[in-house]
UniProtKB/Swiss-Prot annotation:
Localization annotation: Cytoplasm
Highest classification ranks of the organism: Bacteria, Pseudomonadati, Pseudomonadota, Betaproteobacteria, Burkholderiales
Keyword Lyase: yes
Transmembrane segments: none
Cited CDD domains: URO-D
Binding site residues for substrate: 28-32, 47, 78, 158, 213, 334
MF terms (GO), sorted A to Z: uroporphyrinogen decarboxylase activity
Species annotation: Ralstonia nicotianae (strain ATCC BAA-1114 / GMI1000)
Protein's UniProt name: Uroporphyrinogen decarboxylase
Site positions per UniProt: Transition state stabilizer: 78
Keyword check for Cytoplasm: yes
Length: 364
């Protein structure tokens, strides 16, 4: 039997239930802005050495929680674990980011693709279980654990391009010239992501997030067909947790503010939004069907403390202008920069918790 949660504010917010304050966590909260993370990564020898070790992954997952009173932990891993398990030869070059030795470019490459055996990703599921155990203090679990995956489209971008890209010329060329091949890749990716997230849920993930990092690179109409439809398939394929309760699902398309109405119809419990979106309008546009997560510009954290506090208050007030503060998870609009001063994060966390409590006393 799992330990009860000491702090379930994050899960209640995802379910749009009343909360005493606005919970927060940060995308890339375990990362290079923390000196303790860099020390652990040095011991691991490489990024993959870090990500593929359940012990190291557990250590770095807990580091931001030991420094700040965050309301959720997120599994330390990488979105490219799934295509790596497909045998595409993932490596991380210093200063260049991820690279695949065998990108998916030809009809033969696509024909050779298959959903990977989840046993090859056991290190991820072992990390989930180990993190859940490590979160327990005095018989209670400190905060919930989030699992995650890249979206089918975002994974396809890396698989076809062979790494990151400024213009996605190769993958978009395939999409327009051979949509049949692209749909085949996306079908395999969606099936793999469903298996992957369900295995994380079985291992103990209490919420899951789908990162559609490159969905915003698509044209209107194309996004709905080649990204959103496959994320909806993923949401539909996820199962309940060990307690029989639905595990909340968060969808995040960076640059996807144009499509919030459609995203809210996927069955997801929450939508991540970036800093280009007004949260009050986002609530209206989504009709109260989903919780919202976001949406501070990460570069605000390079400002002075007073400016950080002012921008935090602006985000919280924008959401509360919709009538209440329920159903809001505070986050950045994208991942935290590696150059962020750790003390700025302390200011952010304090202001979110303090001001959101005060704001609730002023709301009807």
């Amino acid at each position: 039997m799992s330990a009860p949660l000491a702090n379930d504010t994050f899960l209640r917010a995802l379910r749009r239930q009343p909360t005493e304050y606005t919970p927060l966590w940060l995308m890339r909260q375990a990362g290079r802005y923390l000196p303790e993370y860099n020390a652990t990564r040095a011991r691991a020898g490489s990024f993959l050495g870090l990500a593929k070790s359940p012990a190291y992954a557990t250590e770095v997952t807990l580091q931001p929680l030991d420094r700040y009173p965050l309301d959720a932990a997120i599994l330390f891993s990488d979105i490219l674990t799934v295509p790596d398990a497909m045998g595409l030869g993932l490596s991380f070059e210093q200063g260049e980011g991820p690279r695949f030795a065998r990108p998916v470019r030809s009809e033969a490459d696509v024909a050779a693709l298959s959903v990977p055996d989840m046993a090859s990703l056991q290190y991820v599921f072992d990390a989930v279980s180990e993190i859940r155990r490590a979160l327990v203090q005095d018989g209670r679990q400190r905060v919930p654990l989030i699992g995650f995956s890249g979206s089918p489209w975002t994974l396809a971008c890396y698989m076809v391009e062979g790494g990151g890209s400024d213009d996605f010329r190769t993958v978009k060329s395939m999409l327009y010239a051979r949509p049949d091949l692209m749909h085949r890749i996306l079908e395999i990716n969606a099936a793999a992501v469903i298996d992957y997230l369900n295995a994380q849920i079985d291992a103990g993930a209490q919420a899951v997030m789908v990162f559609d990092t490159w969905g915003g690179a698509l044209a209107d109409g194309i996004y709905q067909t080649f990204s959103l439809a496959y994320m909806a398939r993923v949401v539909e394929g996820l199962r309940a947790g060990a307690d029989g309760q639905r595990v909340p699902v968060i969808l995040f398309t960076k640059g996807g503010g144009l499509w919030l109405e459609s995203m809210a119809q996927t069955g997801a419990d929450a939508l991540g939004v970036d800093w280009t979106v007004n949260l009050q309008l986002a609530r209206v546009r989504t009709g109260g069907r989903v919780a919202l997560q976001g949406n501070l510009d990460p570069t605000v954290l390079f400002a002075e403390p007073d400016a950080i506090r002012a921008q935090v208050r602006r985000v919280l007030e924008d959401y509360a202008a919709g009538g209440d503060s329920d159903g809001h998870v505070f986050n950045l609009g994208h991942g935290i920069s590696q150059f962020t001063p750790p003390e700025s994060v302390a200011v952010l966390v304090d202001e979110v918790h303090t001001f959101s409590r005060a704001l609730r006393t002023r709301l009807p």
